[in-house]
């Protein structure tokens, strides 16, 4: 099993999408890319910590590649929006990839270039924290109530009901071969 860390707006949304992707065994919501150790959701929401709301995906590379993970990521949120996704505004909602090694860094660059070419637009997705062959930004798991949010509280949350189903539909329409049956 391997891992990937990505940030594409509210982690509830990104987590919900990747829970439906083949080869993915675990999705953990959390914070990465900031300057405060062990940040809380309340702190991150102020935008002052520098963290992004992200997800750490554990996946089987024999089922889905890192390249395909990045393609699904870029294709299920709007990577052209700087420091926001829809009504969620702030650096904590930026579109970013946090490669865990140099190979993932190269795949991230290639995925962004592919997305730009295929869509005729320019993604503002950043590649962050990679120094040499290591990710230097610490990962901090989000509070327990954020984990598997869509599967529980999210089904009753008006924000989630408005934002998550269109992302899941985009996954099912544009990335059908990567959807769990």
What would you call each of these model-derived segments?
Residues 1-181:
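Flexible coil/turn and secondary-structure edge motifs
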